[in-house]
Amino acid sequence: MPQVRAYACDDARSQYHPMIIDIREPGPGEVLFDIKYAGICHSDIHTARSEWGPIPYPFVGGHEIAGVVSKVGEGVTKFKVGDRIGVGCLQGSCKECEYCTDGHEQFCDNPHAYWTFRAGPDGKPTFGGYAQAMTVREDFACHVPDTVALEHAAPLMCAVITMYSPLRRWGAGPGKKVAIVGMGGLGHMGVQLAAAMGAEVSVISHGRSKEADARQFGATAFYATAEEGAIESLASSFDLIICTVSADDLDYLGLIRALKPFGVFVDVGLPENPMVIPMRAVVNGNKVVAGSQIGGIAETQEMLDFCAEHDVHPVIEIIDGDSITEAYDKVVASKVRYRFVIDTSTF
């Protein structure tokens, strides 16, 4: 069994540190690949710090992963040695239930989807992308187009599919007015994607410090909620609003009122506390309040191809392994523009 270098934490309060982990040889239908880059997602932080419940330690995070195939198992047809590969949140599902066969493997109910870290089908803990290699089922990996840099590909596997899926599902495109709430790791990609789809894009943020960036990414309007009357002025303005923030004091009612009749509000920010929205604001206008969770494997491949075709990519800061804990703290403090990506060659 190969051994590789990785970075792990030992409990909810520990620093990330180097360690050696075992990686299984690829079995039938599996590929082994060398991880080149791994993105840092806020859900890595929640998980590592046991904020979403207890987890097994040591914990190796990372579900935004890009690399190069080094070995293939028996019967593999999707990949060959040397192929560029991306892996996101999923490492397995039954592939037979109604959700899997419809291309929504993340909602597998037979018995459930298996996430990139936590535990595999055998019940044993699995390690994420903060490592130098990984073995994965070929049908839970995607091809990274040649025109997409691997360091850019890593965040595409979670942050970008999280935005791409609801934009596609709810019809962002020519003639549609789309608002992105928040200009962080998710939001800055939502602006680029919606603009590339042909929508008229606005950004709603607390202040104006990121307005120039938003316009460079393709936004045609910018609204700062810290300014008096900003949300109220947007009544009946948008066909689609995607909210990427988790602030408890966000004016959700004002955002619902900012929708046109038949408009859709999608939350991907996962606020910790319940959202309080008077249903009258939803019913009056036939509006929809929805959520969205990543995307299936086929849709993720579609997203990668779309980003390659339209030159959509994240703005990133590349860090080394010793900087992971510091990067976590910066993400929590919203001090990153716009996504940290770990270079595993520094391990």
Locations of regions flagged by a protein language model:
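C-terminal hydrophobic helical "lid"/dimerization subdomain
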Residues: 1-4, 253-254, 297-347
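Glycine-rich Rossmann-fold phosphate-binding loop(s) that bind the pyrophosphate
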Residues: 159, 182-186, 270
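Short glycine-centered segments of the SAM/dcSAM-binding site in methyltransferase folds
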Residues: 84, 177, 263-264, 288
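Helix-to-beta-strand junctions that scaffold the AdoMet/dcAdoMet cofactor pocket
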Residues: 259-261
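Adenosine-nucleotide cofactor-binding segment
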Residues: 174-183, 195-253
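Rossmann-fold dehydrogenase core element
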Residues: 264-266, 277-317
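Glycine-rich beta-strand-centered segment in the early N-terminal region that forms part
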Residues: 22-38, 51-101, 106, 127, ...
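NAD(P)H dinucleotide-binding glycine-rich loop of Rossmann-like/cofactor-binding domains
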Residues: 78, 94-181
